[in-house]
Each structure stands twice: as structure tokens, then as C-alpha cells.
Amino acid sequence: MAQPKRFQINAKHYFLTFPKCSLSKEEALEQLLQLQTPTNKKYIKICRELHEDGQPHLHMLIQFEGKFNCKNNRFFDLVSPTRSAHFHPNIQGAKSSSDVKSYIDKDGDVLEWGTFQIDGRSARGGQQTANDAYAKAINAGRKSEALDVIKELAPRDYILHFHNINSNLNMVFQVPPAPYVSPFLSSSFDQVPDELEHWVSENVMDVAARPWRPVSIVIEGDSRTGKTMWARSLGPHNYLCGHLDLSQKVYSNNAWYNVIDDVDPHYLKHFKEFMGSQRDWQSNTKYGKPIQIKGGIPTIFLCNPGPQSSFKEYLDEEKNQTLKNWAIKNAIFVTIHQPLFTNTNQDPTPHRQEETSEA
């Protein structure tokens, strides 16, 4: 007569199912953590589900640091803390931890301990395919969660193509720039020259009313005259200060106009594209793919007097005469000599005051 087969499972990851188990997830986890094993536990995930007959079941994934050779089929038995009852599991070695984790996630009532240990079994022919992994990443809702999904379900792609994946997810989960809220109402700028007011009425508006080729404006004046605050109070805009950042985190193709503030004209990239309100142009980035700019919106250039700031002085340089002839056809140049406001009209808006008082 053949000897009964002795129980033995030698695996790094275990999948346990406890049928008709009344323990809570927390009670089960506490007992599992007390089990003495020759290799450290790295991760435990427990799911509690109710079957059609109303009986509770527990599913568990246990990951060890190294292989655990289990020869006792009662090793993982659990006991009730309140009554004389033992719960015996079905024990299997988990060939793919990712697949087991996905399976026990299906009901949502889960408890985790430790850090999940990624394996590549799914990508080598398990239930999970690359398309499934990327579909799950897209449905994650957030970039950080999508990266976690790809790291777990497509680890090879995560390591070899991280740069492209990261860049693509920035596009998929693009976060629009937060709308700017001016601390001052436009009406509080009561010393604005007629020349500026007229320019605004002709060029700053939504796309339906905007001229096909708006005219830009260069405003030169001393510091603390209100140039920046006035320019930013006119409507939805892109604000580029000190240098140009045309990434989608900063630059919106839906803005009504651009504000370029305190950028030395000698080093202003895309001078003509901005000043000429040009449409459909590209900006090459140092480490990324070219950025497509919709364009067709005017730009307010703000500067102080001086050779490293003034657009007028820059265009008056002998080498820039051709550029100057082009610029005066595409922009107006205004020099202001006094603040655009009176002190009594520079109280913040009520909305801004509320924010300040709460801070």
C-alpha cells in the first residue's frame, strides 16, 4: 500500500484561503505576525469576503524574505480569541504574487502589512499581460498610482523605459496650472495711461473675440510702479519670470495673453514667436520632447531701464536694427514714469483679505 504523500511546500510567497472564518482581518494579522519562521516576513495582505451563503472567508498573501519550506499543514492554523474554534487554511505556493494580490483585491475589504515585493512572473506569461498592466495604470487616476501599477505589473518596462513612461504619464495625467487670483481688482489701478487701456481693449480677450494677430506691448519703468500686478490682473495668462518655462505645469495654451517679466532680452528665447503672437510653433527642451505651443496670443513684456533689462536699449544696438524694424510693427513700446495706482486704491480685494486673515 502506497504511503500517503507528506505535506510540503517550499515557496517564497504563500497564498492562504480560510473558508468560514469568523476572525477579523486585524485578529488574523496579529496571529500571523506571531508565527515563528526561519525567514523574515516582508508583506502580508488579507482580504475578507462574504460568499453567497453569507459565510465569511479570508484570503491572504504572505511574502517572505527567502524561501520557507513548510512541512506542517497546520502551521498557519488560526484560533478564535473568544471561543474554542480553529480555522484551517488551504495552503498554496503563490507562483505570481501580483496575480494573487490582484485576486484578493477584488472585494476591496483588505488590510496590508509591510512592503509588497514585486515579482516578474506575471510578465512572463501569467494572467497579467502588458496591455492589462498599462490599462490598469491609465485607470489609476493619478500619476503616482499609475507608476506604482507599472512598477508592480511591468517591472521590466519600469526599469528600462522609466524616462519615457514618466514623461508620458505627465501628459496622461496633466494637471493644469492653478488659476491666478489677483490680490487687486483691475479697477484699483487708477493711474493707467490711456495708451495701455486702449491696448488692453484691442488685444486682451478670449479666443472668440481676439484678433488673428494681436499686437504685443513692452512696458518699461522703475520697480514698484505696479507693472506686474496690473499686467496680471487683466485675465487668464501665462506668467514667465526670470526665465522661460513652457512645460505644461506652467504654460497653458488656453491663456488669453503672456506676461514675460524681468527676462534679459539678450537671452530671450523665441523673441519673435512671443512678440509676433505667432501660431503653432515648437520649443525644443534640453532633456525632453519638443513642446507644441498653440500661440496666437499677445505678450506683455515688463522691464526696467538699463542695458541688461531694457528692450528699447537692446533694440537700439547697432546689430539689432533689422530686429528693431520688425519689432515696432508687432508691438507698442510704453515707458511709465509714475505708479499705475494711488495708495488709497491699492487695498487687496475682499477675497484676498479673507485668505490673509485665515493664514
Swiss-Prot record:
Annotated region (Binding to RBR1) at 143-153
Cofactor notes: Divalent metal cations, possibly Mg(2+) or Mn(2+).
Where is the motif (RCR-1)? 15-18
Q: Where is this motif: RCR-2?
A: 57-59
GO cellular component, alphabetical, reads: host cell nucleus
Residues annotated as binding ATP: G221, D222, S223, R224, T225, G226, K227, T228
The cofactors named for this UniProt entry are: Mg(2+); Mn(2+)
Q: Which ranges belong to the motif RCR-3? A: 103-106
Q: Residues that bind a divalent metal cation, according to the entry? A: E49, H57, H59, D107
Looking at the record's lineage, which domain of life comes first? Viruses
| KW Nucleotidyltransferase (keyword) present | yes
- Which segments cross the bilayer? none
Under the subunit heading, UniProt states:
Homooligomer. Interacts with the replication enhancer protein (REn). Interacts with host retinoblastoma-related protein 1 (RBR1), and may thereby induce the transcription of host replicative enzymes even if the cell is not dividing anymore. Interacts with host PCNA. Interacts with host SCE1 protein.
What is the protein named? Replication-associated protein
Q: Which organism is it from?
A: Tomato yellow leaf curl Sardinia virus (isolate Spain-2)
Phylogenetic classification of the source organism: Viruses, Monodnaviria, Shotokuvirae, Cressdnaviricota, Repensiviricetes
